[in-house]
Amino acid sequence: MANLIETGEYMNIRGKKLYVETHGNPKNKPVLYLHGGPGESCYDFSFHQAERLKGSLYVIMIDQRGVCRSEEITEDEAFGLNDLIEDCEELKKVLQIEKWSIIGHSFGGYVALLYASIYPSSIEKIIFEGPTFDFALTSRALLQKTGHLLKKYGKEEVAEESLAYSSSDASSEELLEAYIRLSAELEEKRMEIYNNKEDRTDESLYSDEEWEIFSNRSKIHFDRLKLEGACHTSLLSKIKDVQNLMLLIVGKHDVVTCEEQIKTFNKDARNGKYIVFEESGHSPHYEEADRFAETVIHFLK
């Protein structure tokens, strides 16, 4: 079911080259995929979902500003969270789309909710896949899981530190930095924080050297977002104001969308639906790819 050809093109969006893929008939209902990370790219989503979705939808996927295959952000230019929203809005105009739906994975779910709160009339429906709406809550949950995994692999000292952080009153910024530092201690086991099933994405479309360049760009993107700090604002209070139909998809084994965030969504979403993917961790789009595609098509039709 996979794409191993580069199907994207470069589009000039608000003074920057963005990598954009489109799949399916433009007459189909349009949906924009927003990747997580920050800085993850749409590569794995395209690899697993482009073929599955393109018969029913018009799927647009991007590497966000400064990420992976998109043009890098330079030191002397202004960049912040809001640029990600404005890029979406501009891309929509360039593609001559009046309204589109959004799939937001992980941090992409955060961006999607922010987008809907700023430009509600641009958006039809929203699918959140393992989203975060609150960086502090997500970092706490991730630190807790990291602590348990570190313990499992015999790293007692850092495990204790991780668990202590998760229940401390540290700021959202401090929690994120602690998580980045402590999860790195898991080394090659780090993806166990996220995956229930192994990620079978074939990355051979690009060379190791190319992936390294992409990864460096993405790091700048993430660092600049952290420096700006706007992403540390909780968006949980915005859920109640969204009129759009929303679907929350969470993998049973994922902690990114922690209980408190799920509870708030279920309580506050006016037009919200919640589905658990029993076999998935953080990425149902590849852990249960067929079910994910069917769910998306059914919800957006």
PLM regions and their residue ranges:
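Conserved HGGG/HGGXW glycine-rich cap/lid loop of the alpha/beta-hydrolase fold
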Residues: 12, 16-72, 77
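Short beta-strand/loop motif that positions the catalytic acidic residue
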Residues: 242, 248-250
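Flexible "cap/lid" loop of the alpha/beta hydrolase fold
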Residues: 126-171
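Hydrophobic, aromatic-rich cap/lid helix
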Residues: 192-199, 204-234
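Conserved alpha/beta-hydrolase "acid-adjacent" motif
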Residues: 255-261
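Active-site loop/oxyanion-hole signature of alpha/beta-hydrolase fold enzymes
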Residues: 61-103, 294
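Catalytic histidine-centered segment of alpha/beta-hydrolase-like enzymes
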Residues: 280-293
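Conserved hydrolase catalytic core segment
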Residues: 98-142
